């Protein structure tokens, strides 16, 4: 019986080629006509993102991508008009323009001149020339958009958020990292809480507001009232929010992940508000909140015991706080306590005794632990990731 690979049905070849990386898919297509035909089957390229340098005209580029069924594109460098891409990819689903610093409102405006119903994800991160004008175009012609990345687009203002709230009703994920001009008014637009005609993006599930320095507790009030389906909220480096703002968030039943890293005004009181509410968080990050101490760990054990991931790096916690927390946190998978310089071997022994499900722990910069405590941690049955970083001990204590 003939068993040579050339006897395989094209469908089987396509299944095999589907497991190859992008470069090897292309190489397989060059072997023979049978492999070429199989390699061009759309199932082989399902989910693949084409990464393109648009430098010169290539008439065969987009027909080739469409023949493979590729609908996700990342532009690595943009020296041609963006409209060249839009016209060539009629059914495009995802367009990543992150880091295309030369993209302007004018260039985007010429590309988006009619509705593009297929586009679901648009990444404009670090496209620093983009302003509210572009958001007006996006809101008008990309009404099916579900993911919008605007991190580092520092010229966007509250007016831009009003346009988003008006036109992008299907939006599920929005990244506004380091959009420095945004204030509580803009968040109110998104949440449908202002007197504007915009309904708001009430279907949002993920919202990143990292390093939006003008936001205050009023933004959290808007979010808690209008964005009730939110699952992930990133407020890291938002220095204007305080414990009082967390009281607003404490009854958001859909919220699963909350990032408060480097929010300088958050203290044990804020953690108490979160723990006393009706949250069902699986992930909490309060790293570098230096007003968070051992009392917060007691609150977490009392009201946030469903956490799978907890980050407390550089917080003012000690072995006593660890002792108050670990007995109730049996489901914890990831614990980050790097640069918590008051933690000693005693704390590690408590962790090893009670947190048997841990798969990862960060001990970077925990300078008071020794070989003894480390040996206890390495005996955790599920441990896969151990970050020591600045962990220090004498030569005689080093693990061999």
Curated annotation (Swiss-Prot):
| One family name in Pfam for this protein | LRR_6
Q: Where is this region: Required for down-regulation of SNAI1?
A: 2-48
Q: Which domain of life is it from?
A: Eukaryota
Q: GO CC annotations?
A: cytoplasm; SCF ubiquitin ligase complex
A GO MF label: ubiquitin-protein transferase activity
Which stretches make up the F-box domain?
2-48
The residues bearing each LRR repeat, given as ranges, are 144-163, 170-191, 203-225, 229-250, 254-275
- Its job: Substrate-recognition component of some SCF (SKP1-CUL1-F-box protein)-type E3 ubiquitin-protein ligase complexes. The SCF(FBXL14) complex acts by mediating ubiquitination and subsequent degradation of SNAI1.
Name the record gives this protein: F-box/LRR-repeat protein 14
What gene is it encoded by? FBXL14
């Amino acid at each position: 019986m003939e068993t040579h690979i050339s006897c395989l049905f094209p469908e089987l070849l396509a299944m095999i080629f589907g497991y190859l990386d992008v470069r090897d898919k292309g190489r397989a297509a060059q072997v023979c006509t049978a492999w070429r035909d199989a390699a061009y089957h759309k199932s082989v390229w399902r989910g693949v993102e084409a990464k393109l340098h648009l430098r010169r005209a290539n008439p065969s580029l987009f027909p080739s991508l469409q023949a493979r069924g590729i609908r996700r594109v990342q532009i690595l460098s943009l020296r041609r008009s963006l409209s060249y891409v839009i016209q060539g990819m009629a059914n495009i689903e995802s367009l990543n323009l992150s880091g295309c610093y030369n993209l302007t409102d004018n260039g985007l405006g010429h590309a988006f001149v009619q509705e593009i119903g297929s586009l679901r994800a648009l990444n404009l991160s670090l496209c620093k020339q983009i302003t509210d004008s572009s958001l007006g175009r996006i809101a008008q012609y990309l009404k099916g958009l579900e993911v919008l990345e605007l991190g580092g687009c520092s010229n966007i203002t509250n007016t831009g958020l009003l346009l988003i709230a008006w036109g992008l009703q299907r939006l599920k994920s929005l990244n506004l990292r380091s959009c420095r001009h945004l204030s509580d008014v803009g968040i109110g637009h998104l949440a449908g809480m202002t007197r504007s005609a915009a309904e708001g993006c009430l279907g949002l599930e993920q919202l990143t507001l990292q390093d939006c320095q003008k936001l205050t507790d009023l933004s959290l009030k808007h979010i808690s009232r209008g964005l009730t389906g939110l699952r992930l909220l990133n407020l890291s480096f938002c220095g204007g929010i305080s414990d009082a703002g967390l009281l607003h968030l404490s009854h958001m039943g859909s919220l699963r992940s909350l990032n408060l890293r480097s929010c300088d005004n958050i203290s044990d009181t804020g953690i108490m508000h979160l723990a006393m509410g009706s949250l069902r968080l699986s992930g909490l990050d309060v790293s570098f909140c230096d007003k968070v101490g051992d009392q917060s760990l007691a609150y977490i054990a009392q009201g946030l015991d469903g956490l799978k991931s907890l980050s407390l790096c550089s917080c003012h916690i000690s072995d006593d706080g660890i002792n108050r927390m670990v007995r109730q946190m049996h489901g914890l998978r990831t614990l980050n306590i790097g640069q918590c310089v008051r933690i000693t071997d005693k704390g590690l022994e408590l962790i090893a005794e009670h947190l048997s499900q841990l798969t990862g722990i960060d001990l970077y910069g925990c300078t008071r632990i020794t070989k003894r405590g480390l040996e206890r941690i390495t005996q955790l049955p599920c441990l896969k990731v151990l970050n020591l970083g600045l962990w220090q001990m004498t030569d005689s204590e080093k693990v061999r």
